Regions:
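Acidic, contiguous segments within the catalytic cores of piggyBac-derived transposases
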Residues: 2-208
Length: 208
């Protein structure tokens, strides 16, 4: 997860993130489990020259260093997920499941025509080595890269239809796992912003 810590003083490592409630601040990259923050790293400090895998992969390997060779599953969003990250984590005993951008280098080939032909609740999967990419159609197509479970396993999710009712929609098991685990990131993000708001309200009170 990426989250900014609001800051007003000028600093070299401050970032501008227009999509976040706090536009200016220190960008931190977080590792969390079940709503609890395990480790974080402030973005902007140089850690030497990046490896061939790239700076993003290097960052993930640093913040997961204490959890290697324990067969944990790491869930990531499309900012971090890539075939290079999946391979690097697999070598260190960590499995990966994350949303991914369709144009990432090294992705298994998926024909555009096949993707466009999908209806809601349908999916297709392609494998390349240990990596599996799933393209699942809900209201729109979602791309997922994973190696933590078998590609043949299916499941279902409750989704809203056009009439405002919940319906059961079929999906690969990896998609269900990702949606379930992504909730902890959302909760941690909400707590983070609520805590920042409390600090702002508290420090704005003047005692006369």
């Amino acid at each position: 997860m990426q989250a900014p810590i609001g800051a007003s003083r000028p600093q070299r490592v401050k970032q501008y993130i227009p999509s976040k409630p706090h536009k200016w601040g220190y960008k931190i990259r977080c590792l969390n489990s079940d709503d609890y923050l395990l480790h974080f790293e402030i973005y902007g400090f140089k850690e030497g020259a990046p490896s061939d895998a790239g700076a993003t992969v290097d960052t993930v390997l640093r913040i997961t260093a204490a959890y290697q060779q324990k067969q944990h599953v790491l869930y990531t969003d499309s900012w971090f997920t890539s075939p290079a990250l999946l391979d690097a984590l697999a070598q260190r005993g960590i499995r990966l499941c994350g949303s991914v951008r369709s144009n990432r280098k090294g992705m298994p080939a998926v024909a555009k025509e096949e993707v466009l032909a999908l209806n809601r609740g349908e999916w297709l999967q392609r494998q390349k080595g240990d990596a599996t990419v799933a393209v699942w159609r809900d209201q729109r197509c979602m791309w997922l890269l994973y190696n933590h479970c078998s590609p043949g396993e299916s499941a279902s999710l409750e989704r809203w239809n056009d009439f405002g009712r919940k319906v059961s929609v079929g999906c690969p098991r990896a998609i269900r796992d990702y949606f379930y685990r992504a909730r902890s990131v959302d909760v941690l993000s909400q707590l983070h912003y609520a805590y920042c708001c409390e600090l702002t309200l508290e420090t704005s009170v003047q005692v006369c």
